Amino acid sequence: MAQQGSSQMRPQGTSSVTQTTTETSASPILHLRPSKRKSKKKPSVRWTEDTVDNEHMNKKKTKICCIFHPQRQFDDGSSCESCSSSDSSSDGSDTEDSKPNAYEHQPHYKNQSKVPQ
């Protein structure tokens, strides 16, 4: 009687092999696109024939933040070193050449309103 591989027999029992596979799915990509315009023209300004261009009409501005007074030269003989720093241009020491600028010059209006009697 011959034994067939009895020395190499494995014990009988239950054995299980676990194989884990993870599937990675690509996350969806959202593509944003602008809505389609009906016309391809860019918006533009349209002027009528009666539009007045007042850019170069020598009009004075009504909102003024400051008035420019040119500085005197340091070597100017009319300036006094011993004068106080509170001197202003309204003390009468202006030269005859200095004129008021456009904003300092006040227009002379004639009163044309009539009061009912």
UniProtKB/Swiss-Prot annotation:
Query: Per the record, where are the segments of Basic residues compositional bias?
Result: 33-44
Its GO biological process annotations read:
glycogen metabolic process; intracellular monoatomic ion homeostasis; mitotic spindle assembly checkpoint signaling; regulation of protein localization to nucleus
Q: Where is the composition biased (Polar residues)?
A: 1-13
Q: Where is the composition biased (Low complexity)?
A: 14-27, 76-92
- In the UniProt record, does the keyword Mitochondrion occur? no
GO MF term list:
protein phosphatase 1 binding; protein phosphatase activator activity; protein serine/threonine phosphatase inhibitor activity
Q: Does the keyword Nucleus apply?
A: yes
Which Cys residues form disulphide pairs? none
Q: Which InterPro entries match?
A: PPI_Ypi1
Q: Where is the composition biased (Basic and acidic residues)?
A: 47-57
- State the residue spans of region: Disordered: 1-61, 73-117
Enumerate the subcellular locations listed in this protein's record, separating them with semicolons: Nucleus
Keyword annotations from UniProtKB, A to Z: Nucleus
The UniProt entry's GO CC annotations, sorted and at most eight, read: nucleus; protein phosphatase type 1 complex
What is the similarity comment for this entry?
A: Belongs to the YPI1 family.
What this chain does, per the entry, is described as:
Regulator of type 1 phosphatases which maintains protein phosphatase activity under strict control.
The record's PANTHER family line, in alphabetical order, gives: E3 UBIQUITIN-PROTEIN LIGASE PPP1R11 (PTHR20835:SF0), E3 UBIQUITIN-PROTEIN LIGASE PPP1R11-RELATED (PTHR20835)
Q: What is this protein called?
A: Type 1 phosphatases regulator YPI1
Where does this protein come from, organism-wise? Meyerozyma guilliermondii (strain ATCC 6260 / CBS 566 / DSM 6381 / JCM 1539 / NBRC 10279 / NRRL Y-324) (Yeast)
Q: Which gene encodes it?
A: YPI1
